[in-house]
Amino acid sequence: MAKRVQVVLSEDILSLGKDGDLVEVAPGYARNFLLPHGKALPVTPAVLKQVEHRRAKEAERLAALKADAVAFRTALDTIGRFTVKKQTGGDDVLFGTVTNVDVAEAIESATKKLVDKRDITVPEVHRTGNYKVQVKLHPEVVAEINLEVVSH
């Protein structure tokens, strides 16, 4: 069996892993490609310490993002209801439909905080009334808001 060497990746490599991963590769691959092109670093105690420090900072950053998302979800729950005004015809039928852009604008006007329209899931809305809309604030945090569609 061939000898393998350990290196720490300094950038994402599709077939090996992500930046900061400790991987085992063939010695020639490390010596001829990864190390000269700056795609990996040889394993030393200093490099391992640096990688652990970077991982800890990244974990703190991700935890802070999640905490912000949870706080924003609480703020959305506190507001309770968001209103979108649309033009209607007879029997409260809308001309057009309510889109995720409309919901994003309603959230922004109420909270002064931007929400990406791609993170909003709106059910099919063709009449005035109340609807539940899901807003993905973080990969692990989803808020469900009440949307009131009214005629103007």
UniProtKB/Swiss-Prot annotation:
Cellular component GO terms, alphabetical: ribonucleoprotein complex; ribosome
Which segment of the chain is annotated as a signal peptide?
none
> One GO biological process from the UniProt record?
translation
Keyword Lipid metabolism (UniProt): no
| Domain of life of the organism encoding this protein | Bacteria
Q: Which SUPFAM superfamilies has this protein been placed in?
A: L9 N-domain-like, Ribosomal protein L9 C-domain
Q: Which Pfam families did the record assign?
A: Ribosomal_L9_C, Ribosomal_L9_N
Reported function: Binds to the 23S rRNA.
> Which protein are we looking at?
Large ribosomal subunit protein bL9
Q: Which organism is it from?
A: Synechococcus sp. (strain RCC307)
Give the encoding gene's name.
rplI
